[in-house]
């Protein structure tokens, strides 16, 4: 079957248009990716699911807590497949666990963020994605 140039162009444009929602879904444009904010609190709920895992955490006011971080936050992680490669699993956290998370907050100021990593009690970092910086040897 021989396609003429205009028909091929239309098919290609339709294909790109259909792919646009997938690119939009995987965009980090809503997050302030240039900001790393530390959140210290307790896990309310840990959701190990696809397409994104979530840690719902509550940050209470305290002497070593940034007042801007007080509240209940939804930390969005990666897929279970990618997070699993970084050392996460379905029982990594449970409600009540103390957690220190470093994340990129939502630009609109609402209580959500893109998880960068969590700091484990032994000082190691557990990254949510393939976002581990070059040279970081933490496990």
Predicted regions and their residues:
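Short nucleic-acid-contacting surface segments enriched for D/E, G, S/T with interspersed K/R
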Residues: 85-100
């Amino acid at each position: 079957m021989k396609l003429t140039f205009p028909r091929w162009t239309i098919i290609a444009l339709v294909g790109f248009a259909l792919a646009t929602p997938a690119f939009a879904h995987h965009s980090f444009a809503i997050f302030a990716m240039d900001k790393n904010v530390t959140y210290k609190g307790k896990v309310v709920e840990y959701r190990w699911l696809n397409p994104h895992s979530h840690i719902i955490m509550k940050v209470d006011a305290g002497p070593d807590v940034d007042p801007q971080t007080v509240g209940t936050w939804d930390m969005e992680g990666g897929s279970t497949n990618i997070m699993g490669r970084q050392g996460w699993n379905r029982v990594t956290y449970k409600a009540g666990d103390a957690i220190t998370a470093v994340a990129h907050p939502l630009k609109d100021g609402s209580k959500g963020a893109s998880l960068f990593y969590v700091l484990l009690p032994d000082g190691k970092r557990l990254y949510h994605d393939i976002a581990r910086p070059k040279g970081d040897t933490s496990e």
